[in-house]
Amino acid sequence: MDRFTQLTLTSLVCASAAFSTLNASADIVISGTRIIYPQSSKDVTVKMENRGNNPLLVQSWLDDGRDTVNPQVLKLPFVVTPPVSRIDPSKGQTVRITWTQQPLTQDRESLFWFNVLEVPPKAKDADSQNALQLAFRTRIKMFFRPDGLQGDPAVAAGNLQWTQQGTALIANNSSPYYISMAKATITVKGKKIEVDSHTIPPLSHETIPVKNAPALQGGGIEYIAINDFGGTEKHQATIN
């Protein structure tokens, strides 16, 4: 990647968060909503498709949750190839992610984010010179899964323990796997309370604010978790 392209795409990365609030949609579609990277795998691949009508310049990279940091500054133990590619309409591109073998935590999963930034071609006609060129950014989770972790990721979400602390709900995750909760509904004394989506870290807990929270102990919670394949699974539990 030449220096000009590097600077241009870096600038677009910093601005893309603002673009995402506009009424438009991305043309690049990623196959899947998450990536699982088993430690024993040499690499993993991600497929992308351009479903728009124009060729697009696409940059791919990983971040560690700091989504506004210049990709050139992040020093992560992965290589993404190709980092920049052109994808024509109705065509696809496969991106390869390779772990560099730099040490990562071995007793639990590590979470990273796979980013795709698509840049449309510049308008050529005079009437379009002042048109706003939108760059779209898509992020999906990538879980690095060490070999030999205890338990089964397929059942981890169903084993969450729920407690109340003040006006917050505490989701306790005793497994070594991240749990992605799409939504949840608390039912207490016949009243239903909707809870926003959250990601519960492994061997830890997540504090979830609950507006106007009554006493929740003894109430029930129904929550939807996202599995390795992007599918959803419904679970029920009692709040202790």
Question: Where are the model-predicted features located?
Answer:
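Short, hydrophobic/aromatic beta-strand segments
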Residues: N54-L62, N172, I179-A184, H235
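Terminal connector regions
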Residues: T100-L149, V155, A215-N240
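Asparagine-centered strand-capping/turn motif at beta-strand->loop junctions
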Residues: M48-G52, L169-S175
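N-terminal signal peptide c-region/cleavage motif recognized by signal peptidases
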Residues: T21-N23
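Short, basic/aromatic beta-hairpin or loop at an interaction surface
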Residues: D64-L74, M181-T185
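Bacterial N-terminal signal peptides that target proteins for export
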Residues: M1-S11
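Intrinsically disordered, low-complexity Pro/Gly/Ser/Thr-rich segments with frequent PxxP/GP/PP motifs
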Residues: N70-P103, G190-L216
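Beta-sheet-dominated interaction scaffolds and their linkers
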Residues: S25-E49, G151-Q164
